[in-house]
């Protein structure tokens, strides 16, 4: 039976790890041991932050909406309540984009929310 040498496999694994560590600082980019630890940690951060990114963007949309709605004389919570009472089902992402790119259309939506609040309350 032929002797099995594993140099090719380990070299490929090491190369893959070092390529993933490109751009890291210090020994983390060129020693296998440090690079492996750094790459493992970076993958943990990446996994965690894919979830965190969703929260961060939602918070950004809410901040933008709050600022835009306050210019038109409402608060964010009253605006969302008014939209619910008016039956408008546009999500926060689209609303924040409207507030930035098409202020006239956004103003019309705010007026809808205001009128729904006036009739309901």
Curated annotation (Swiss-Prot):
Q: Which cysteines are joined by disulfide bonds?
A: none
On whether ATP-binding is a keyword of this UniProt record, the answer is no
This protein's GO cellular component annotations are: ribonucleoprotein complex; ribosome
Gene Ontology molecular function: any one: rRNA binding
What sections of the sequence does the record tag as coiled-coil?
none
Tell me which Gene Ontology terms the entry assigns under biological process. Answer: ribosomal large subunit assembly; translation
InterPro entries referenced in this protein's UniProt entry, alphabetically: Ribosomal_bL20, RIBOSOMAL_L20_CS, Ribosomal_protein_bL20_C
> Keyword RNA-binding, does the record have it?
yes
Which Gene3D superfamilies would you find in this protein's record? 6.10.160.10, Ribosomal protein L20
The similarity annotation says: Belongs to the bacterial ribosomal protein bL20 family.
Cited NCBIfam families: rplT_bact
Q: Which PANTHER family match?
A: 39S RIBOSOMAL PROTEIN L20
What protein name is recorded for this chain? Large ribosomal subunit protein bL20
Gene symbol?
rplT
